[in-house]
Curated annotation (Swiss-Prot):
It is found in: Cell inner membrane. It comes from Rickettsia bellii (strain RML369-C). Keywords: Cell inner membrane, Cell membrane, Membrane, Transmembrane, Transmembrane helix, Transport. GO terms for molecular function: transmembrane transporter activity. This is Putative transporter AmpG 1. Gene3D superfamilies: MFS general substrate transporter like domains. Belongs to the major facilitator superfamily. It holds the Pfam family MFS_1. Its main location: membrane. GO terms for cellular component: plasma membrane. It is a multi-pass membrane protein. The keyword Transmembrane helix applies. The chain crosses the membrane at residues 5-25, 40-60, 76-96, 98-118, 141-161, 169-189, 217-237, 265-285, 290-310, 320-340, 356-378, 383-402.
Length: 410
């Protein structure tokens, strides 16, 4: 079990690192280049591949890469392929500047996001195969620990390095690190022996309609109405965080925090808080069921958003920033752990990759599509109303969660 958890931690690190490349780190790069808030919000669409990766998951479940599969095995061969693609395109991005050619910059970033989301899908499926259902809560905490650590390297580390290096140089370093992670993963998976659930479907009928196929693989989970309810919850629950994440860098720069303060408090302390929150959330879920944990964590996290309003009123204040980021990150780590544990608990039987990707894609929709209006909200209504909005929109998700809980208890 301990070996499996080590591999899961590495899975999390790689996923967290990759998503920052086209996520918050890219967002900070755009903000530093004085790209308009409306444009920054619109470019959250770069992470759209995370919303539709479930469409490609059947390929990862069923299709073997002829030569790599013999050497590395089914999942690891796909990981190798996507990692090499990421190294290549991240290196290309390191020669571009968003201010000079925003369209080309965004296009390459979108390609990186596509391969990153593919790899995230494969790693997530791999994770559901090597952990038994009873350990999902704790394993999710370990995964989030690694995920946040990867985010720390690619986000806080990059912003701190931007004091001394250009972002073009930093993204060249990213390309090298992705290759190193691949080597570590190959060694870890090949030489750490663990029990793996091997009931993964290897063939599928390519003539089947994709929607009929998805309907069939989701059938063991529940009725169509119940699944729709779950999808609505998955979209709404992460919506407040995703709005904030798109605008947090412009907000901190607006308050005149410098790169060192943003890297150390806004990012490093934020990730540390999220790691603590993830582990704390995993520990609590060992004693409390997943749905009750999601409800409790969601309420606490919503209250933490109010601190951003207080920070805006007081202006630049290092102590208040420390408290705000700490409260936001710890409670956010708890909600994320419960969220992932909930998704993982839904996956069962064959085609786990497709099931997990389909549900986690709702998180992608929440992260990529709805936040495109975040910049417009800030420009037209101000920062205080923006953060008030992110607090209020937590309520619908919790009401849907109660509906799900009632259906499960019937």
């Amino acid at each position: 079990m301990s070996r499996s958890l080590s591999i899961i931690w590495l899975f999390g690190l790689i996923s967290g690192f990759n998503i920052m490349i086209t996520g918050n780190t890219l967002n900070y790069w755009l903000a530093k280049e004085n790209i308009a808030l409306q444009t920054i919000g619109l470019l959250s669409l770069i992470t759209l591949p995370y919303s539709i990766n479930f469409l490609f998951a059947p390929i990862f479940d069923s299709l073997k890469i002829k030569y790599l599969d013999k050497i590395f095995g089914h999942r690891l061969s796909w990981i190798c392929l996507t990692s090499i693609a990421l190294v290549f395109f991240v290196y290309i991005l390191s020669f571009l500047n968003p201010f000079d050619n925003l369209l080309l910059f965004a296009s390459i970033s979108l390609i990186i996001s596509f391969f990153s989301s593919m790899q995230d899908t494969i790693l997530s499926a791999f994770r559901t195969e090597i952990v038994n259902k009873e350990s999902l809560g704790f394993a999710s905490g370990i995964y989030i620990f690694g995920y946040r650590f990867g985010m720390l390297l690619a986000n806080s580390g990059a912003i701190y390095l931007s004091i001394y290096l250009t972002f073009n140089e930093i993204y060249k370093i990213f390309a090298i690190l992705i290759f190193i992670y691949l080597i570590l993963l190959i060694v870890g998976v090949k030489y750490c022996r663990f029990d793996q659930n091997n009931d993964i479907e290897q063939t599928t009928n390519n003539n089947d309609d994709i929607f009929a196929f998805i309907k069939n693989i989701l059938k063991p989970i529940g009725s169509i109405s119940f699944i729709i309810l779950i999808l609505i919850f998955l979209i709404l629950y992460r919506l407040p965080d995703n709005f904030i994440n798109v605008m947090i860098n412009p907000f901190l720069l607006h308050l005149n925090y410098d790169a060192f303060e943003i890297a150390s408090v806004g990012k490093f302390w934020g990730v540390m808080g999220a790691i603590v929150g993830g582990l704390l959330g995993g520990f609590i879920m060992k004693k409390k069921n997943i749905l009750d944990s999601i409800l409790l964590f969601g309420i606490i996290h919503a209250l933490a958003h109010i601190l951003f309003i207080i920070l805006k009123i007081h202006g630049k204040n290092s102590t208040l920033l420390f408290i705000t980021i700490g409260a936001e990150s710890i409670t956010g780590g708890m909600t994320m752990t419960a969220y992932i544990a909930f998704i993982s608990s839904l996956c069962q039987g064959k085609f786990r990759a497709t099931q997990y990707s389909f549900f986690s894609s709702m998180m992608g929709i929440s992260r990529s599509i709805f936040p495109i209006i975040s910049g417009y909200i800030v420009v037209n209504f101000g920062w205080q109303n923006f953060f008030l909005f992110t607090t209020i929109i937590t309520i619908p998700s919790l009401l849907v969660l109660l509906k799900i809980k009632n259906k499960l208890q019937q």
